[in-house]
Amino acid sequence: MGRLDVKNSWIEFHQDEMTSFLKLAIIGTVLLGVAHGANLTAAEKETYCELRSAIQTFLCIERLRDFAAKVDELDMDKKSELKEFKKTCDSLKNCFAITRCGPNSTMDEAELFRMVEKNCEAVVYIHEDFSDCSDKLTAKKSVCFDNWDPIPDGIHLEEDEKKVEKMKKETCKRYFGKDDCMKKEIVETCSQKEWDKFREQFINLSSDLVSKCDFSRLG
C-alpha cells in the first residue's frame, strides 16, 4: 500500500530561524493574552484571536512533524504501532481544533485538518474494521491487495491544475486496483458484504479526490 501524504508546505518550517528566546516570548505573550482576553474590545479580540490561532498553529507544527514521521514508519501489521498512531492522530486533531478561534478557519487550516482526519480514518479502518479480511488477503499473498495504492503520490502537492485533473482521472480508473481487482479479491476471499463496506468506506474517505468518478461499474 502507498504512503499517506501530508502537505509538505506546512511541514517545511525553518525551525533554525526561530531562537529559543523568541519561542518563550511568543508563548508568554499568548498566556498573558489568555489571562486578559475577557477585557478586550471587539476589534482587539479579533486581533488577539488571530495571534492565538497563529501561535497555536506554530505549536501544532511539531505534532504534525511527528504525525508525518509515524505515517512513513508505520508498520501496518503491528497493532501496538497502530495504537500509538491513533494517539498521535487524536493529539494532532485536538491541536488543530484549538486553532479555530471562531466559527471560521482559513482554507488551508480546514484542508489540512480534513486531510489529517481522513488519513487517520483510513489507517484505523484498514486495521480495525477490515483487519480480518486484510489478514486473509495477506495470507493468500494477494498481488492485487499488495499493489493497491488508491491515492497518487504527490497529488496534494501538485499546483498545476491540469496535472491534478489528469491525476484524478487516472485515479478513477485504478482506485480499486487494476481492472477493479480489489472487488474480485475481497468478494472471493472475504464476502460480498465486506466488499460493500470497503467500497463505501474508501469512496467516502476520498470524496474530494473521486467525487467525479463513475463507480457504477462496480455494481
Swiss-Prot record:
It is found in: Membrane. Residues 44-219 are extracellular. Glycans are attached at N104, N204. It is a single-pass type II membrane protein. GO terms for cellular component: membrane. Residues 1-20 are cytoplasmic. This is UPF0376 protein C36C5.12. It comes from Caenorhabditis elegans. The lineage of its organism: Eukaryota, Metazoa, Ecdysozoa, Nematoda, Chromadorea.
